[in-house]
């Protein structure tokens, strides 16, 4: 008598739903393959050449400007985004809907137009720049201009992630804390912040990612000077203009790698906050 192993009527792949398969095919074509291709292109170069291109002084300076200002912009929006979300959810005032719609303007506005607008307002002869220039303060075509552009394009992320969380909070909890003698600052730190902290960190992470990759607005409002306000995305574009595809690929890989590491850290903090408050 011969033994027959039971045959599988369906393979593992056929048991998967079409939505699952479509999701993975879509992500593979749009996200995974381009990222892997970038790393493979860099890995095709000799290791010494990769190190040389990645650690050029101008590239290192561009990394510092890019990540330093992106983190600063994300932190600023983390603070002011919460304040704006608080105002939108806790107060009624004339023109509130119009004010709320303006928050999403950086999403819809082309980045080049955003850069042109900021340069028009904050240049030495701009609407605001002309009043601060006599005091020796220059925003446009400096690192301050880069920071301003990054703050502008990443502002909506924190506001839109925190706003629904604030709407879910019960006002009675805040009133109870106040009735028990808690000060407004104590109420914020102990009652309001813990449940919205994961949303704040999520918005900060999204805003940081957006700021790191920003090009259109920064290239207009900054001076794009090496070792001063030149950011990595603009440096990559300059390398491509010089037909230095190897340099552009390596710098892009470094930028992507460091961004992934920082996002991993922020997401880890977000998960920790969710478990701590859950």
Swiss-Prot record:
Its main location: membrane. PROSITE patterns: ABC_TM1 (PS50928). It is a multi-pass membrane protein. Pfam families: BPD_transp_1. Gene3D superfamilies: MetI-like. Signal peptide: none annotated. The chain crosses the membrane at residues 22-42, 67-87, 102-122, 139-159, 188-208, 217-237, 246-266. Belongs to the binding-protein-dependent transport system permease family. CysTW subfamily. The complex is composed of two ATP-binding proteins (CysA), two transmembrane proteins (CysT and CysW) and a solute-binding protein (CysP). Part of the ABC transporter complex CysAWTP (TC 3.A.1.6.1) involved in sulfate/thiosulfate import. Probably responsible for the translocation of the substrate across the membrane. This is Sulfate transport system permease protein CysT. It comes from Synechococcus elongatus (strain ATCC 33912 / PCC 7942 / FACHB-805).
């Amino acid at each position: 008598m011969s033994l027959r192993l039971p045959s599988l009527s369906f393979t593992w792949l056929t048991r998967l739903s079409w939505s699952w398969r479509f999701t993975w095919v879509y992500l593979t074509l749009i996200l995974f393959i381009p990222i892997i291709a970038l790393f493979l292109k860099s890995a095709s170069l000799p290791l010494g050449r990769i190190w040389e291109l990645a650690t050029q002084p101008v590239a290192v300076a561009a990394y510092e400007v890019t990540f330093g200002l992106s983190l600063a912009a994300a932190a600023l929006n983390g603070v002011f985004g919460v304040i704006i979300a608080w105002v939108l959810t806790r107060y009624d005032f004339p023109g509130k809907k119009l004010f709320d719609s303006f928050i999403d303007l950086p999403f819809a506005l082309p980045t080049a137009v955003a850069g042109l607008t900021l340069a028009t307002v904050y240049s030495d002869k701009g609407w605001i720049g002309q009043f601060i220039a006599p005091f020796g303060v220059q925003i446009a075509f400096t690192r301050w201009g880069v920071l301003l552009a990054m703050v502008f394009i990443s502002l909506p992320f924190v506001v839109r992630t925190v706003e629904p969380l604030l709407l879910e909070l019960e006002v009675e909890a805040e009133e109870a804390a106040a009735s028990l003698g808690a000060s407004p600052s104590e109420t914020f730190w102990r009652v309001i912040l813990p449940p919205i902290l994961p949303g704040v960190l999520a918005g900060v992470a999204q805003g940081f990612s957006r700021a790191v990759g920003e090009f259109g607005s920064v290239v207009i409002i900054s001076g794009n000077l090496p070792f001063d306000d030149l950011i990595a995305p603009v440096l990559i574009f300059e390398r491509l203009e010089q037909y230095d595809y190897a340099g552009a690929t390596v710098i892009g890989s470094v930028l992507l790698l460091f961004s992934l590491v920082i996002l991993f850290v922020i997401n880890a903090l977000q998960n920790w906050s969710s478990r701590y408050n859950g």
